[in-house]
Amino acid sequence: MLRNSRIVLLLFTISFTSFAQSGKLEKGKESLKNSSSSASSSTSSPNSKRSSKSSNYTDEDSTFGSFFGELFIKLFAYTAYGVLVETPFEFKGRMHDAEIAHFAYENSTHGNFIYTDFINYSNVRFDFTNNFVMENRNLYGNNFGLDFRFLKRFSVDFGYLYVTEKSNLKRDYFSLYSALLKYHRIRTQNFDAWFGLGIMYIGCDVNKTSFGVGLGGELFVKKPISILFSHKWTNINNEEVHNTKMLLKYHIKKYHISSGYEHFKIGVSKINAFSVGVGASF
């Protein structure tokens, strides 16, 4: 009798432990919902015995300091503009007036941008993508994207990631929405690189919105092949959320097929997924 009760207790413990285990999505979402309360230690500054010394700056010192302060600000602004927007050398180069191509590899010499003398070669362009992502047979989903290009060097990127996971006889879900205003910093006929700022929203019981950043690029190796990389990042309650793509694309006129690797970081959980998808440009 005692032996049978021990067996029953052992089976109950094993089953309870297996059911208590959480999947990646559940663990990740819980880490995003639990805001880490950082104990703000009150810093007592012993300024009681500090003698307030009066600053005896002369007019010459003030003028000297303001001159170098203004010079530093101008130099910083000039450097930042050159790094983020355009340098004087690029202003006179062909990349300055590069037009948006109707679609990648419209001819064999250019990708997303084309050097042309025609005004308004293409005012706008819509790029649609949809990739099926899968880490294993229990964890998979879709990564949908819409990129609206305009004014030669800008675009608005909308993304929707939906992942589902089956664990312990239940199914969990995760959704990530993103909207970024992107500036295409490098616009050559063989390489397109961008950075972007915007917002990202996490649904499925988390329901948090946060500031988001992103960067990426696409290298057009040789028609019809290109290599794409993109990375989007946000922070929720001091936990990071990442959406990273590294894809090989095969272009067929206005359409393409892609395959590669996608990585997702959801708080404490990391997902490494195989990706395959399709896309179109209009």
Language model region names:
Residues M1-I114:
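Cleavable N-terminal export/targeting peptides
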Residues F67, L71, N112-F132:
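Transmembrane beta-strand segments of Gram-negative outer membrane beta-barrel proteins
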Residues G111, T116-F118, I186-Q189, C204:
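Charged linear interaction tracts used for macromolecular binding and regulation
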Residues D117-N123, E135-G141, R149-L151:
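Short, surface-exposed loop/turn motifs at beta-strand boundaries within globular domains
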Residues N190, F195-S226:
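Histidine/lysine/aspartate-rich catalytic loop segments that bind and position anionic ligands
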